[in-house]
Amino acid sequence: MIKVFVMPTCPDCTKVMAQVKDNPEYQIIDIGAHVRNLKEFLYLRDNDPVFDAAKRYGFAGIPCFVLEDGTVTLSSLEAGISPARNGASCRIDGSGC
């Protein structure tokens, strides 16, 4: 099962959530729903180099995908999901929302 870390207020996340809804191959984890989920995501974000560019440019790093082999990626394509069309994107400073 592929874990998908999201927040419903993130435009990119809502597109991914709509694509994987009711698909048993994906587990949606809302990082805003419980502190346990947030801690799990922050551990990944703090320790996996896949987030380096996202952090450098002020992005949160969601949606984030943890593949069945443990690989962490920010690419929906690598997780078997069609890439979202360009649209709104939120940065940590609130711009782009």
Task: Go through each PLM region and give its residues.
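Residue-level detector of bioactive/disordered segments in secreted/extracellular proteins
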Residues: 12-15, 66, 92
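A short, hydrophobic beta-strand/beta-hairpin element that forms part of a small beta-sheet core
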Residues: 61-73
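Local sequence-structure signature of Cys/Sec-based thiol-disulfide redox active-site neighborhoods
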Residues: 1-31
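Short glycine-/acidic-enriched loop or helix-start segments at secondary-structure transitions
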Residues: 14-16, 38, 74-77
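Thiol-based oxidoreductase modules, predominantly thioredoxin-like and allied folds used
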Residues: 25-48
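C-terminal cap of thioredoxin/glutaredoxin-like
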Residues: 70-90, 94-96
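Thiol/disulfide oxidoreductase modules built on the thioredoxin-like
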Residues: 54-61
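Short, glycine/charged-enriched secondary-structure capping and boundary segments
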Residues: 18-20, 43, 79-80
